[in-house]
């Protein structure tokens, strides 16, 4: 997902993208940032060809600023060979929808390739802002034009790429949450004995969200206390959360989704304020007691760094973080992490796990583009041709989304061994199997923003969990009525069918 960014490389990437992609010249960055910008080693696992050379056209690419635009720098030598110059337009992570929608409505034609979060596809495609891609994908020869959609995992193909039976986008980032924890602490004999003495249970990674609170409280220590046989020189925390305004709602949904409830019933009545949902939000609120005091300012970067700097015992994060945790240039806990399914709910004598699938990224061709064919090839080149290299490096936040990404563990060179990389990929498969989707209908941005606003108010103590979710239900009904309830009911039923085709709901 992600807003994910290696902060130390930010300045270099911005400079490199502006200089190298817009002008085609300019000095290369040096030092650690230069290493961050170095293209991954080509794997040659995917066969592709250049198109017939375009006549020096400029393709304008818009996307959220940061390391997920790095592939355009990695492969900057490819585009001139196709007769294409790339110009990058960076926007803030939280501003993607507003910026792109504003330009679409204005008909400015400012973009050729549009990078966006796939929950917006219903809005963008249904309003005619995106070019249908099906005819482009059929062009010959295959090596130039075919993005091999059959290789894209079903959730990312059916939900991320399609609207009303047509393909409008290509996946570049397949997102899901996983739990990441300090295995050295969970296996430490002294910590195991202390946990057993205190709780009468063996110390294990949390299976349920109740376990999450218990284990988080256990590992929360003050400066001067002992942790795994050493005296702490700063406070240490059992867990941390993405509690910042913007996407904190996803960490609430992680706790609620295993209930089997959906955002709406068949007639668009919100189910977001059920007793199970209220209990889930209360768990989220309670978890902040075991988190750093500034956790309400934690987005992706801060949550990642809290773990990789050795300040917390466990987090729920996107599946790219283990790659960064294995990279000594980004992590102080190399070799000390393990990962698995997010905690779940005990239902009917078993634990049910559901992992939220927030954000993700797709690339599409703007319907207003004057260079649609060139824009399509650029999108296809990033989404398919170079995708293994882009998802396997620790210097992007792009996550696996195709079968080929799982069958080449040797590409994930930040891990010490191929076996370790293969184990990581197995855990990612588990996370995706537990996947729970976002809202994939027009209005998704408004529904999710209302949810996030009130989740954040509950985290701040400004509303109780019940007050917060009752307010969400009221606002969701208002959004539905404003967009047209009967229309939204029809679209929601179509979305439910897509969820079923993708294997995400029964």
Stretches with model-predicted labels:
Residues 46-53, 65-85, 180, 184, ...:
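Short, polar/charged alpha-helical segment
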Residues 34-58, 340-344, 393-457, 485, ...:
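Long, aromatic- and glycine/proline-rich binding clefts that accommodate carbohydrate-like moieties
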């Amino acid at each position: 997902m992600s807003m994910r960014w290696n902060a130390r490389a930010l300045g270099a990437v911005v400079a490199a993208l502006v200089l190298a992609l817009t002008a085609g010249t300019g000095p290369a960055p040096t030092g650690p940032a230069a290493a961050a910008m170095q293209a991954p080693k080509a794997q040659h696992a995917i066969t592709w060809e250049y198109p017939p050379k375009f006549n020096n056209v400029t393709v304008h690419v818009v996307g959220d600023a940061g390391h997920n635009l790095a592939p355009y720098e990695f492969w900057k030598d490819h585009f001139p060979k196709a007769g294409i110059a790339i110009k990058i337009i960076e926007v803030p992570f939280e501003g993607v929808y507003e910026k792109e929608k504003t330009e679409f409505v204005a008909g400015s034609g400012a973009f050729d390739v549009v990078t966006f979060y796939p929950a917006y596809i219903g809005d963008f495609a249904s309003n005619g802002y995106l070019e249908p891609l099906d005819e482009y994908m059929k062009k010959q020869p295959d090596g130039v034009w075919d993005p091999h959609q059959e290789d894209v995992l079903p959730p990312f193909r059916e939900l991320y790429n399609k609207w009303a039976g047509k393909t409008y986008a290509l996946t570049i980032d397949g997102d899901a949450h996983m739990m990441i924890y300090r295995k050295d602490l969970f296996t430490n004999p002294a910590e195991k004995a202390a946990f057993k003495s205190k709780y009468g249970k063996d110390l294990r990674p949390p299976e349920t969200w109740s376990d999450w609170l218990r284990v988080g409280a256990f590992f929360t220590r003050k400066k001067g206390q002992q942790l795994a046989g050493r005296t702490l020189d700063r406070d240490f925390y059992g867990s941390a959360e993405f509690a910042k305004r913007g996407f904190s709602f996803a960490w609430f949904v992680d706790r609620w989704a295993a209930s089997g409830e959906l955002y709406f019933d068949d007639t668009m009545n919100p189910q977001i304020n059920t007793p199970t949902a209220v209990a889930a939000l209360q768990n989220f609120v309670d978890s902040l007691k075991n988190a750093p005091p500034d956790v309400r300012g934690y987005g992706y970067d801060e949550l990642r760094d809290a773990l990789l700097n050795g300040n917390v015992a466990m987090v729920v994060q996107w599946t790219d973080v283990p790659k960064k945790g294995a990279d000594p240039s980004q992590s102080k806990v190399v070799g000390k992490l393990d990962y698995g399914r997010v905690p779940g709910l005990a239902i009917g004598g078993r634990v049910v796990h559901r992992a939220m699938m927030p954000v993700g990224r797709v690339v599409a061709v703007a319907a207003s583009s004057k260079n649609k064919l060139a824009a399509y090839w650029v999108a296809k080149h990033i989404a398919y041709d170079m995708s293994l290299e882009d998802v396997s490096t620790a210097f992007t936040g792009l996550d696996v989304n195709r079968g080929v990404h799982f069958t080449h563990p040797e590409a994930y060179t930040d891990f010490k061994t191929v076996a370790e990389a293969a184990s990581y990929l197995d855990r990612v498969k588990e996370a995706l199997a537990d996947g729970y989707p976002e809202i994939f209908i027009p209005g998704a941005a408004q529904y999710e923003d209302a949810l996030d606003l009130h989740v954040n108010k509950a985290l701040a103590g400004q509303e109780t969990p019940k007050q917060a979710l009752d307010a969400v239900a009221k606002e969701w009904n208002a959004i539905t009525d404003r967009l047209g309830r009967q229309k939204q009911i029809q679209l929601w039923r179509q979305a439910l069918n897509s969820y079923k085709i993708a294997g995400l709901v029964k």
